[in-house]
Amino acid sequence: MGKKNEKIVEEAEKVEAETMEVDEQPQETPQVDDEEDLNVPSKKKMEILDPKSFEQDPSNLTLIMYEEDHTIGNSIKHILSRMDEVEFCGYNVPHPLEDKILFRVQTKDGINALEVLAKAFESVEQIFSTIRGKFEESYEQSQS
């Protein structure tokens, strides 16, 4: 082998050795907070889908609820559908693998849909509190 070829082989071996040294070093993995959910931008639980549209017409609201499913969606829809000021309400789970629901509320003119939705959440919270209380009471009775 000529001197030129030997030099090329030496350079190639040197580069290969350096590459192996780099590859063998532990790679720094990005630290991810256990509570961080990549589906939720900025850890928001709710987000108005089109804030400008809602500002122009507060009786129409489309909301994204992150980390929620049919349990809360159907409960809220049921409460809202019984309210006189609500003209339309419904929800949709965009995809079974996405941990969010889209919720739509339309109220009569002059009535703020977000305020009506807040009342519905309060009602659902009261219902779930009552259920929990009755469950705990029954459990305590069964243990004695």
Swiss-Prot record:
One of its GO terms (biological process) is transcription elongation by RNA polymerase I. It is found in: Nucleus. Keywords: DNA-directed RNA polymerase, Nucleus, Transcription. SUPFAM superfamilies: RBP11-like subunits of RNA polymerase. Its main location: nucleus. Residues 14-47 are annotated as: Disordered. Residues 18-38 have a biased composition (Acidic residues). It comes from the Eukaryota. Pfam families: RNA_pol_L_2. Component of the RNA polymerase I (Pol I) and RNA polymerase III (Pol III) complexes consisting of at least 13 and 17 subunits, respectively. Belongs to the archaeal Rpo11/eukaryotic RPB11/RPC19 RNA polymerase subunit family. DNA-dependent RNA polymerase catalyzes the transcription of DNA into RNA using the four ribonucleoside triphosphates as substrates. Common core component of RNA polymerases I and III which synthesize ribosomal RNA precursors and small RNAs, such as 5S rRNA and tRNAs, respectively. This is Probable DNA-directed RNA polymerases I and III subunit RPAC2. It comes from Caenorhabditis elegans.
